[in-house]
From Swiss-Prot:
There is a cross-link at residues 201, 204, 237, 283, 626 (Glycyl lysine isopeptide (Lys-Gly) (interchain with G-Cter in SUMO2)). Signal peptide: none annotated. The modification Phosphoserine is found at residue 97. Keywords: Isopeptide bond, Phosphoprotein, Ubl conjugation. This is Uncharacterized protein KIAA1958 homolog.
Length: 716
């Protein structure tokens, strides 16, 4: 037994850690069961275990590394039964063929592990025939874990029986844990000390309800309920063509049956959906079928080598990650706290592992549920979850995101700008969340609410709507939500707008709320140290082509510039509220045409109001027609504008078309320009001429230029 002392401190630490973990789940004291035969490199492997079936294979040397050979490991097959001594680490020199040992039986498939953190390391050596082949090397054995203890605190005597009602799958194993816990079998094989006979011994089976480990989990959810979305999960590779070597999605799920002596055949691994009682969610597991020529000569052409891998990242699929033993979450420690904190309403029927791998509706750059789950896999839904879990997510520090497939999602889609689509869907989610949290689930579809009833709801909505954390929205955000809801109604063709006079009472409530938010410092307006453009800056803009009528963007930027200068429009709100009918083409007493901002659309709601001119734009040809404010505004309003957007109540600023070719005379879409795009026009002009502090330039930055030019703008 002196050879047992020839081991590394790391391996000794692993043995002590396993013994400690074993003591938390089993009252039996483990001891040294077997001293397995030497491998081709002269190292030994000791098997520690107890009479309950808990086993640990302990390498006795630290110098003998895997090098250029392939290791033997258990496959996660609950009905696994093999007579091959290579499974338990017996070297090939002392092994006899399964056909010789058991006549009449077909040759069993040899299981083989590539370099992956899932390997169980039952033997550090292999046949001499494999040593000369160029395969991946195990450079750091510290990243490999040798624990194969397959039980938990919740194990009962019934766990020793075949689990016919509890099919196991590779994908439902706990991600990011000790790899040896992933590879287990319902039967362990041990070599007797006094004979070469193979002893079949049942090992306690682990069920997902026992415990799970989540490394970096965040609370998400969907229609089917909350879920723990793993942030370090990798996208499973699509299944490729069948061949000697292929990597595919882990759809090979073994089904646990009562037939313990079932032959190890590749056909067993493909389970039919009809016999799967629980959904198959191949979140991270994948199967590699290695080339037959990499195995020993005796197994060439007959034995398929299967490897279970748990990739951590798509960029380095073979890179191993060392997980400290202190990070292990033992049963009964943190699981209960996490479940009580994040999943208070989760039914007990749903296992913790299923919750950890259920599809998420998170829209951040993680693996989508369609990529994580095959089309044939059923969704985890029960009547209990449908009754107690709302149909929206509860992601931490994020506003709820609904995943309801209805016609409203199509109404939010914009073919012009993805930002508009995002803002419209956000407004829809805010409305739905407000309705569901205020007992108004029948009114979540805003397009089916009559105008009078909707006006009453909006009066309460503008005053009481809040974020998911209970705080108020900024004034600009609340205004954008209103525009998003109005956009949905317009796309649905309901025949009314929430900005019309029919909704005057709700509009009044909105203005009162906006005034309160502004007084509280929650207007949302950026506080900037305003910087003014100089004459040289403006001249550089013209020369650089940033201003003019050469493209839809330049013409729109020029119109914004002149409206700010000559029509006294100084804030984003004034530009955003501007309607087509608010600017009129008039004539003065000298019969000179000019454009004036009269706000005629806003005056319709004011009885007895007289026309007030907030500014005028005359012809100015001192610098030519290319820079005339009157001519450029005329082109924007009457030449390059869609005919359907020339009504008085049409929005003034429209989204510019991005395709410069084949536009014809119409340069703009039939859609209002977004607030973000409108706000960024002036900073973008400053950025194009390479000015500093571009974000400090606003619509007011053009004021001094207009005074120096001596414009025709005036107020009456």
């Amino acid at each position: 037994m002196e050879d047992c002392l020839h081991t590394s401190s790391e391996n000794l630490s692993k043995l002590v850690s396993w013994a400690h973990s074993h003591g938390t789940i089993c009252s039996l004291i483990p001891n040294l069961k077997h001293l397995l035969s030497e491998g081709s490199h002269g190292n030994l492997t000791a098997m520690w275990g107890c009479s309950a079936g808990h086993a640990y294979h302990w390498p006795l040397t630290a110098t003998c590394r895997a090098g250029s050979q392939e290791r033997v490991c258990f496959q996660d097959n609950r009905s696994f039964n093999s007579d091959s001594p290579s499974i338990i680490g017996v070297p090939s020199e002392t092994q006899t063929s399964p056909v010789e040992r058991y006549p009449g039986r077909p040759v069993k498939a040899k299981l083989d592990c590539n370099r992956t953190r899932d390997s169980c390391d039952f033997s550090y050596c292999s046949e001499p025939s494999e040593l000369d082949e160029a395969v991946e090397e195990y450079e750091d054995e510290n990243t490999l874990f040798d624990m194969v203890c397959e039980s938990s605190v919740t194990d009962e005597d019934s766990d020793f029986e075949p689990q016919t009602q509890r099919p196991q799958s590779i994908a439902r194993k706990r991600p990011g844990i000790v790899p040896s816990s992933i590879h287990s079998s319902s039967q362990g094989q041990m070599v007797d000390e006094c004979s070469n006979d193979v002893i079949i011994k049942k090992i306690k089976q682990e069920i997902p309800e026992d415990y799970y480990i989540v490394a970096n989990a965040e609370l998400t959810g969907g229609v089917d309920g909350p879920a723990l979305s793993l942030t370090q999960m990798a996208k499973p590779k699509p299944q490729t063509h069948a061949g000697p070597s292929c990597v595919g999605s882990a759809k090979l799920i073994p089904h646990v049956t009562s037939a313990i002596n079932t032959e190890l055949d590749p056909h067993i691994l493909s389970a039919s959906p009809s016999v799967i009682s629980r959904p198959i969610i191949p979140k991270t597991a994948r199967v590699s079928l290695a080339s037959p020529n990499r195995g020993p000569p005796g197994a060439h052409g007959t034995a398929h080598q299967v490897t279970m891998q748990m990739p951590v990242s798509t960029s380095h699929p073979n890179k191993q990650i060392s997980i400290p033993l202190s990070a292990l979450q033992l049963p009964g420690q943190d699981e209960q706290v996490a479940s009580e904190e994040f999943l208070p309403h989760l039914p007990s029927q749903v296992s913790s592992c299923e919750v950890a791998l259920s599809p998420s509706v998170n829209t951040e750059p993680e693996v989508s549920s369609s990529q994580q789950q095959p089309p044939a896999a059923p969704t985890i839904t029960t009547e209990a979850t449908a009754q107690c879990i709302p149909a929206y997510s509860t992601k931490l520090n994020k506003f709820p995101v609904f995943n309801i497939n209805d016609d409203l999602n199509g109404l939010c889609t914009s073919a012009v700008s993805p930002n508009t689509t995002k803002a419209t869907r956000y407004a829809l989610n805010v409305w739905r969340y407000w309705c569901m949290t205020n007992g108004l689930k029948d009114h979540t579809d805003i397009t089916k609410i009559p105008a009078v009833k909707l006006n009453e709801l909006l009066e309460n909505f503008y005053v009481t709507v809040k974020k998911s954390d209970g705080s108020d929205f900024l004034a600009t955000s609340l205004h954008a939500i209103r525009r998003g809801l109005d956009r949905i109604l317009k796309n649905a063709g309901v025949g009314f707008s929430i900005t019309s006079s029919t909704f005057s009472s709700s509009t009044k409530k909105l203005k009162e709320k906006l005034w309160v938010l502004s007084k509280a410092g929650m207007s949302g307006a950026r506080s900037r140290n305003i910087v003014y453009f100089s004459l040289s800056d403006e001249e550089e803009m013209w020369q650089a082509g940033c201003l003019g009528d050469d493209s839809p963007i330049t013409l729109l930027s020029t119109v914004v510039k002149y409206n700010s200068q000559y029509l006294n429009m100084r804030t984003l709100q004034e530009h955003a509220d501007l309607m087509y009918g608010d600017i009129e083409l008039l004539k003065d007493p000298q019969n000179q045409p000019y454009f004036a901002r009269t706000d005629s659309v806003k005056r319709e709601s004011r009885s007895g109001s007289t026309r007030v001119c907030h500014g005028k734009i005359y012809h100015e040809h001192s610098r030519g027609h290319k820079q005339c404010p009157y001519c450029l505004l005329y082109k924007y309003m009457y030449i390059h504008r869609p005919p359907t957007q020339m009504e008085a109540k049409s929005p003034f600023y429209l989204t510019a078309r991005k395709e410069a070719t084949d536009m014809g005379s119409v340069w703009y879409e039939e859609q209002r320009m977004g607030l973000r795009s409108l706000r960024g026009i002036v900073p973008n002009l400053a950025r194009k001429v390479k000015l500093e502090n571009c974000e400090n330039f606003t619509f007011v930055s053009f004021t001094q230029v207009s005074r120096r030019l001596g414009s025709h703008s005036c107020c009456q």
